[in-house]
Amino acid sequence: MEKFVAVAGNIGVGKTTLVQKLCDILNWTPFYEPESDNPYLPDFYKDMQTWAFQSQVFFLTRRLRAHKNLCSHTGSVIQDRSVYEDAEIFAHNLYRQRQIAERDYQTYRELYQALVEFLPPPDLVLYIKASVPTLQKRIKLRGRDYEEEIDPAYLKQLNVLYDSWTEEFDLCPVLTIPGDDLDFVANNGHLDLIIKKVQEKLTGKEVVVFTEQEMNNS
């Protein structure tokens, strides 16, 4: 594997689209989220407190397997949502909502931390940061009915967890993409700017930011 970039961000922020566009231009290989055939999901939606732990362990094992397969690839790769987000964002949120019991959550964390130690980390995490109104707009545009019912308060809470996680994450550099200001779907100049910043970060530049002037001129 040459370069390994993971794209992170809230529901509907545009992770998959950015992965597709970066791979098309950079000629890298995309690794998308594993298809969800979680056998616990029907039970989970009926009774979250009973089935949250089992459901999250299933998702974690799928994500770990996908991460392992990715690391055996010979070329450069871009991953759509990382294994870290399962634990640090979604399982953590269920715990905060008291849908996972303390004992189960601590067991889950120990399992996650023990396994992650053996995984090669990305060279770079791209965090697409966007406000709830931007997320709602993009969710509506992609037209998934079940997503349009998502409570804005839920998206807000996930944003809080994403901000906290990316601030503390130290396994590799994190480049924050201002999703409210950059429309990499409709504006090729914005996409070019993102690629420029990604390449700067991957070549070792320590401080890489998106300035207002650059964004306005793109």
Stretches with model-predicted labels:
Residues 7:
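Hydrophobic anchor at the beta1->P-loop junction of P-loop NTPases
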Residues 15:
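Conserved lysine of the Walker
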Residues 63-103:
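A basic- and aromatic-enriched beta-loop-alpha substructure that forms the phosphate/nucleotide-
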Residues 140-149, 153-218:
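NTP-dependent small-molecule kinase module
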